[in-house]
Curated annotation (Swiss-Prot):
Presence of keyword Glycoprotein: yes
GO BP, sorted A to Z: follicle-stimulating hormone signaling pathway; G protein-coupled receptor signaling pathway; regulation of signaling receptor activity
Stated name of the protein: Follitropin subunit beta
Signal sequence bounds: 1-18
Residues bearing carbohydrate: 25, 42
Disulfide bonds: 21-69, 35-84, 38-122, 46-100, 50-102, 105-112
Subcellular location: Secreted
Subunit-structure text: Heterodimer. The active follitropin is a heterodimer composed of an alpha chain/CGA shared with other hormones and a unique beta chain/FSHB shown here.
Gene Ontology CC: one annotated term: cytoplasm
InterPro entries xref list: Cystine-knot_cytokine, Glyco_hormone_CN, Gonadotropin_bsu, Gonadotropin_bsu_CS
Amino acid sequence: MKSIQFCFFFCCWKAICCNGCELTNITITVEREECRFCISVNTTWCAGYCYTRDLVYRDPARPNIQKTCTFKELVYETVRVPGCAHHADSLYTYPVATECQCGKCDSDSTDCTVRGLGPSYCSFSEIKE
């Protein structure tokens, strides 16, 4: 019986601790309207699970904040989009997460919804790797 309890608690600990908020590699599609096509760029972003709860009874003294896996530190990198017209700005700057945390999503700098276009969305039909 003790071994079953140990296995249960170990699995719970593993699920909580090891699937936390951490850096992950992603590929995003970047585009410049003047260039008329997209390129794929590898970067890092935050993904994982954060402990959160939704209270049954609302308490005005304790605001209900849903925690999400989001960046703590960012740097920005710049890539040149090939094929742009000579007069067009061909540089594209994108964020790269360097540290993650479980916290409130900042809607001023982040798309906090599930309705975003997604990292592989391209307005144009041609994507260059």
